[in-house]
């Protein structure tokens, strides 16, 4: 394959993996470690 095709496939895979990892971090198993800043600073 040509170099441009491989670069396009590589960038596409990076975008898809980041798009899948972001919701997993926000609502999956690692979200238990996130802090709620609004609960920490109640006035």
UniProtKB/Swiss-Prot annotation:
Membrane topology, record value: Single-pass membrane protein
Gene Ontology annotations of biological process type: photosynthesis
Cellular compartments annotated: Plastid, Chloroplast thylakoid membrane
Source organism superkingdom: Eukaryota
Pfam families for this protein: PsbN
Membrane-crossing residue ranges in chain numbering: 5-27
Keywords: Chloroplast, Membrane, Plastid, Thylakoid, Transmembrane, Transmembrane helix
InterPro entries, A to Z: PSII_PsbN
GO cellular component: chloroplast thylakoid membrane
Family: Belongs to the PsbN family.
Cited function: May play a role in photosystem I and II biogenesis.
HAMAP family cross-referenced by the UniProt entry: PSII_PsbN
Name of this protein: Protein PsbN
């Amino acid at each position: 394959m040509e170099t441009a095709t491989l670069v396009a496939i590589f960038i596409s895979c990076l975008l898809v993996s980041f798009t899948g990892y972001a919701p997993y971090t926000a609502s999956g198993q690692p979200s238990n470690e996130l802090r709620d800043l609004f609960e920490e600073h109640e006035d």
